[in-house]
Amino acid sequence: MSDKSESYKVITDNRQARYLYEILETFEAGIQLTGTEVKSIRAGKVNLQDGYALLRDGEIWLINAHISPYNASGQYFNHEPRRTRKLLLHRQEIRKLIGKVEQQGLTLVPLKMYLKRGWVKVSIALGKGKKLHDKRESLKRRQDQRDIQRAMKNY
């Protein structure tokens, strides 16, 4: 029987972030949401593609992540799709992130959003932007791995 505390369901994955950034360290953060946002997330209507996290006044905010309005409720009770949402982390994690982002010039990007024990969580990462040659190198490495797997499959 699987352990319930370690199981989670991935809602959305930001694959573009792994291509554009060299991921150095990841963190799990809670997110402050309204009821209609949670319902939309459970329905899988979320997009982290253009999203990023920002440090402001000792807090971390998720900006530009798109959560579609919930269809079953009227327009009056619905949420704004691209509103700024607060990320919930421990104080020592926030201090660590502040130091790395301000001193080393790193970026905070959301990698995936998932449900863990009924709570919506966001996996954010400290990333360093890749240059064009780094992107080409990672594509070449991935293609080489595919070729090796194909060759191994035939023999």
Curated annotation (Swiss-Prot):
Region (Disordered): 135-155
UniProt keyword annotation of Isomerase present: no
Protein localization: Cytoplasm
Gene3D superfamilies cross-referenced by the UniProt entry: 2.40.280.10
UniProtKB keywords: Cytoplasm, RNA-binding
Biological processes per GO annotation: trans-translation
SUPFAM superfamilies reported for this sequence: Small protein B (SmpB)
GO cellular component, one term: cytosol
Function: Required for rescue of stalled ribosomes mediated by trans-translation. Binds to transfer-messenger RNA (tmRNA), required for stable association of tmRNA with ribosomes. tmRNA and SmpB together mimic tRNA shape, replacing the anticodon stem-loop with SmpB. tmRNA is encoded by the ssrA gene; the 2 termini fold to resemble tRNA(Ala) and it encodes a 'tag peptide', a short internal open reading frame. During trans-translation Ala-aminoacylated tmRNA acts like a tRNA, entering the A-site of stalled ribosomes, displacing the stalled mRNA.
HAMAP family: SmpB
Protein name per Swiss-Prot or TrEMBL: SsrA-binding protein
The organism of origin for this protein: Trichormus variabilis (strain ATCC 29413 / PCC 7937)
